[in-house]
A protein has these predicted regions:
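Interdomain hinge/linker elements that couple catalytic modules in large macromolecular machines
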Residues: 2-15, 155, 159-240, 244
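Pre-Walker A adenine-sensing motif
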Residues: 16-29
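Hydrophobic anchor at the beta1->P-loop junction of P-loop NTPases
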Residues: 37
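Conserved lysine of the Walker
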Residues: 45
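Hydrophobic positions on the alpha1 helix immediately C-terminal to the Walker A/P-loop
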Residues: 48
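Short glycine-rich substrate-engagement loop in P-loop NTPases that contacts/grips substrate
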Residues: 68-95
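Structural recognition of the conserved hydrophobic beta-strand(s) that form the central parallel beta-sheet
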Residues: 125-131
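Short regulatory helix/loop adjacent to the ATP-binding pocket of P-loop NTPases
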Residues: 134-149
């Protein structure tokens, strides 16, 4: 029987520094724009925001970080745009550089009214994350009246996959593994292919059958599912042998 090492909750998965994205956010530090971090579910938006917060704490003094995570029940009472606005204003600190971070901002109905009002005051450096299904690039200009910059986060690239496993000894073998496992790093926590596949399937179904259907009130989910499957098959056709090493 194979011996299994049990890990504490929170220790089951390693993290890597996603330098490309972190460097981009650092470049935008202090600019007069709303920084909007978008991407599909489980692509690493929240982890990126947390990494940036840690960077600020380690490199700057006299700062005030206002952090709101709408996935956390502790912030349930401010999932209303007036309450969100009031909460941020209450936590503002005069004489400091005030950073505002709102994770999963779309969970607060009419959030854009609060964010636009806070932006207009000119006293916050604002960062928000949101799912692609609710913060499409085409919608951002309508939602935000002030200047904004979008940072779009993708699942792990092949290069990041190699970095995660700290191995570039056999690129062909690693690419074959990557083609099966994909770039959703949350699936790497599971030991069996079945569990990894179930994780990816659940993320896919949440995006297609819940997020998109809910946003656009689509009556026929079967057509949407078939279309998404066709697009996935089409993308695989374009991953050819010459593509392998160019991805690292």
């Amino acid at each position: 029987m194979k011996k299994i090492q049990f890990l504490k909750v929170g220790d089951y998965m390693k993290t890597i520094t996603r330098t490309k994205y972190l460097d981009r956010i650092i470049e935008l530090n202090g600019t007069p724009d709303i920084k909007i971090i978008t991407g599909i579910r489980r692509s690493g938006k929240s982890k990126l925001m947390q990494a940036y917060i840690e960077y600020l704490k380690s490199n700057f003094e006299n700062i005030n970080i206002i952090f709101i995570d709408f996935m956390d029940l502790a912030y349930e009472e401010i999932k209303e745009y007036h309450a969100l606005h009031a909460y941020v204003e209450e936590h503002y600190q005069e004489g400091k550089t005030n950073y505002l971070f709102v994770d999963e901002v779309q969970m607060c109905p009419k959030f854009e009214l609060a964010i636009n009002s806070l932006y207009s005051k000119g006293k916050y450096d604002i960062y928000v994350t949101g799912s692609n299904a609710f913060l499409l690039s085409a919608d951002l200009a309508t939602l935000f009246t002030g200047r904004y910059i979008e940072i779009h986060v993708f699942p792990f690239s092949f290069q990041e996959y190699c970095q995660y496993y700290d191995d570039i000894s056999d690129k062909d073998k690693l690419f074959d593994e990557y083609a099966i496992k994909g770039g959703l790093a949350g699936s790497y926590a599971y030991r069996t292919e079945k569990d990894r596949t179930n994780y990816i399937k659940e993320v896919y179904e949440t995006i297609v059958t819940r997020d998109l259907v809910q946003k656009y009130a689509l009556p026929d989910t079967l057509v949407l599912q078939r279309l998404s499957e066709f697009l996935m098959d089409l993308s695989l056709i374009h991953i050819s042998e010459p593509t392998r090493h160019s991805l690292i």
